[in-house]
Amino acid sequence: VHLTDGEKNAISTAWGKVNAAEIGAEALGRLLVVYPWTQRFFDSFGDLSSASAVMGNAKVKAHGKKVIDSFSNGLKHLDNLKGTFASLSELHCDKLHVDPENFKLLGNMIVIVMAHHLGKDFTPEAQAAFQKVVAGVANALSHKYH
C-alpha cells in the first residue's frame, strides 16, 4: 500500500485514539450481524441467534481482538502486507476456506467502527487512508487464493 506521509500520520493519529480490542470485537460482531452468512465460519462460537447475542458473545469478542491485533501488526508493516499476512492467507484459504470477499467486508466494518468511536476526529483524510489500508490488508489476505 502506497501512503503519503500525511496519510501515515492520519492513520497513526486515529489508531492511537482507539481501544483496539473494542474496535475488533465490534467490527467482527457487526460483520456477523450485517452479513449473517459469515456466521458459518464460527459454528463453535455458541449463540449467534440475534444481534445482542452476537455483540455480547465472549468468543466473538476474543476473536475480534485476535483479528484486530493482526490488523494492528499490519499497520507496522504497511510496506510488506503480503509478507505480514502470508500465513493467515494460507490458513484462511487452505484450511478454513473463507470467501476472500469477507476480508473486504470486515475491512469496511473496521472503518465504520472507527468512525463511530472517533466521531469528528475520524476526518475524511483519515477515512481515505484507512480505506487504502483495509483494501491492502484484504488483498494481502486474499493473496494465497490467486
Swiss-Prot record:
Instruction: Describe, from its UniProt entry, the tissues in which this protein is expressed.
Output: Red blood cells.
Residues annotated for heme b binding in this entry: H63, H92
Phosphoserine-modified residues are where?
A: S44
Keyword Phosphoprotein listed: yes
Kindly list the positions at which N6-acetyllysine occurs in this protein.
K59, K82, K144
Q: Where is the Globin domain?
A: 2-146
Q: Which family does the similarity line name?
A: Belongs to the globin family.
One Gene Ontology MF term: oxygen carrier activity
This chain's function reads: Involved in oxygen transport from the lung to the various peripheral tissues.
Which Pfam family is one of those matched by this entry? Globin
Q: Which residues carry this modification: N-acetylvaline?
A: V1
Put simply, this protein is called Hemoglobin subunit beta-S/F
Q: InterPro entries annotated for this entry?
A: Globin, Globin-like_sf, Globin/Proto, Hemoglobin_b, Hemoglobin_oxygen_transport
Q: Which residues carry this modification: S-nitrosocysteine?
A: C93
Gene Ontology biological process terms from the UniProt entry: hydrogen peroxide catabolic process
Q: Which GO terms describe its cellular component?
A: blood microparticle; haptoglobin-hemoglobin complex; hemoglobin complex
Keywords, ordered alphabetically: Acetylation, Heme, Iron, Metal-binding, Oxygen transport, Phosphoprotein, S-nitrosylation, Transport
Q: SUPFAM superfamilies, per this entry?
A: Globin-like
Assembly and interaction partners: Heterotetramer of two alpha chains and two beta chains.
Output the CDD domains linked to this UniProt entry.
Answer: Hb-beta-like
